[in-house]
Amino acid sequence: MSTEQGIKAEFYTDKPKTIICDLDGTILKHAHVFSDLDKHDPQLNPGVIEKLNHWDSLGHTIVLMTARKESAREMTERHLRSLGVMWDHLVMGVTSGKRVLINDKLELQDQDRAVAVNVITDIGFNNTDWDGIGL
């Protein structure tokens, strides 16, 4: 295979996706005060566990990220496991400000290789057209 063929295969072959998903307000009901996180049982938002399980069964990589402090990792992982949430990576300590994903594509006219989805806080995953974005 030539270098050019290898590059095209890398960019144009359908492969499992990397799904990067926020935690509070997206996966879990939003707890607005960090110090209250361990005082209440965490709650999943509607449709979340079904979609995460589906994506996992398709071989997608699931990266959860949160503005929670690194010091809350043990508690956060315990909560997620107790709810049956599966993930590949958990990134702690990102800001709660705007998140920007930067990715490349081979040619200007090619389809974008990154997609952003914004769900309404605490509404869950049932009202999103996942098929429309290839998920």
Give residue spans per PLM region:
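HAD-like aspartate-dependent phosphatase fold
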Residues: 1-135
